Regions:
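A short gly/proline-enriched turn/hairpin at secondary-structure junctions
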Residues: 127-133
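Exposed beta-sheet edge and beta->alpha loop/turn motif
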Residues: 43-63, 143-203
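Central antiparallel beta-sheet cores of small beta-barrel/beta-sandwich binding domains
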Residues: 1-52, 56-57, 67-74, 86
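Short, low-complexity N-terminal intrinsically disordered segments enriched in polar/charged residues
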Residues: 78-107
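Solvent-exposed loop/turn segments at secondary-structure junctions
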Residues: 124-126, 203
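A solvent-exposed, acidic/Ser-Thr-rich amphipathic alpha-helical stretch
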Residues: 133-146
Length: 203
């Protein structure tokens, strides 16, 4: 926010794509313009409430003013960064790169790409096998051998339903959903040469 001017985005979950927003805030009143391909597509107009839960609610109207819908958003988590241009402030690399990697993680798990996942994990890593038994996977071979137990049907469902846009992040890295997968930079990453790796699997 700069002198009441706002800039940001929100995620269209179905397509895992970001829609850009610009607008202004005055007191508790907010007006936002939704942009698609740089052109106005709709307008949010509402108020911020902090009585029992931090929330923003009001009405969304499309660009021609013919359709209006009520909306309500509630704060679910805070971001470590104060810039919408660099959400994952503690990670080396751009937000797009981090989200692209998480998208590849998600797709590879759902499609059963064992080799790719095995090649992008920080070992050793703790996981749960069938019946809740905890185990430590020490290398790629063990990961591939236990892949179907680790990434079981129910867990894949949670991964499939999780969006890779605007993910929560902190000093531990970036998490998918409610912490079902965590990623971070590879240990040897530098500002000029870096990569990403899975650091936690909470199955």
């Amino acid at each position: 926010m700069d002198n009441g001017q706002l800039a940001g985005n929100y995620c269209y979950k179905m397509f895992e794509s970001k829609i850009q927003l610009t607008g202004r805030i005055s007191g508790n009143n907010i007006e936002l313009t939704e942009l698609l391909n740089g052109k106005p597509n709709g307008y949010f107009k509402g108020k911020i409430f902090t009585d029992n839960a931090d929330r923003f609610e009001g009405n969304w109207t499309n660009s021609n003013g013919k359709n209006t819908y009520a909306f309500k958003t509630t704060l679910s988590s805070a971001c470590a960064s104060d810039s919408h241009n660099k959400r994952y402030e503690l990670l080396i690399g751009s937000d797009d790169e981090a989200e692209k990697f998480m998208k590849q993680v998600k797709t590879s798990i759902i499609n059963g790409n064992k080799e790719w996942i095995a090649n992008h994990i920080s070992y050793p890593i703790k996981i749960k096998l069938v019946k809740g038994k905890t185990a430590t996977i020490k290398n790629k071979k063990q990961l591939i051998e236990n892949f179907d137990q680790i990434f079981h049907h129910q867990y894949k469902g949670l991964i499939s339903a999780s969006c890779v846009c605007n993910m929560f992040n902190n000093y531990q890295g970036v998490m998918l959903g409610h912490g079902i997968i965590w990623i971070n930079n590879t240990p040897e990453s530098t500002s000029s040469r870096y990569g990403y790796v899975i650091t936690a699997i909470n199955n």
